[in-house]
Amino acid sequence: MNSAAGTNGAGGAEVAPLIELRDVVFSYAGHTVVDGVSLQVDRGELVALLGPNGCGKTTIMRLINGLELADTGTYLFDGHVIDAAFLKDSAAAQRFHQRVGFVFQNADAQLFCATVGEEVAFGPAQMGLPADELERRVRDAMKLFQVADLVDASPYQLSGGQKKRVALAAVVSMNPDILVLDEPTNGLDEDSCDIVVNFLLAYVAAGKTVLMSTHHQDLVRRLGARAIYIDRYHHVVEAPSPSYGTESGATD
């Protein structure tokens, strides 16, 4: 497994960023979607990607989760190069996907079980957990996102906000090291948004890491997130443009 050194930690020891992209390029159907993007996310950070539609935010999320592979450049997770060879190792790929929890902007893209309870239990059930630990994780995640009363409901019959909360519960039940969230509050009412915000603040306070995309600077301010702005030319800066507004989002 390839690895790369990172920044100095306590006592001068080398500590790799949890997420690092180095000059990553990705094209789709002859169109360059991500053009030489470099960024880092350290452990315990809450980082927001901002930028206009089409700048590549969603594609960057998919690259980080291993759903896409860069044409050129390097992606490192916890110091290890994530590429086709890495993901062909089924054991390594399974550990990687357990550590990187991804929630799509459209929750329908990741809901596939007959009931909410089965949906939330599916991920941790693949981890070989003892039955009592599996039950505890499912119960806690459903309570956390206030979907416990929907345990026997079909995910397909829920509102958009309920689906989003079920998708979050399903990923969080796996206790990933980092949550990668594509527009996590899109389509949520105020109460559901509060649930998500309070969870994210507590998650990071517990030492976990969050990388999210959003169009809403008010959400970034509320979370105290470090902002990375990607402009329409795919240039990356460490703060959103003062002229950048809060346009409603679409995937890019």
Task: Set out the residue ranges of the language-model regions.
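Helix-to-loop junction immediately C-terminal to a conserved catalytic motif
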Residues: 65
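The feature captures the beta-strand-to-loop junction immediately N-terminal to the Walker
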Residues: 50-52
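Conserved ABC transporter NBD signature motif
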Residues: 73-85, 96
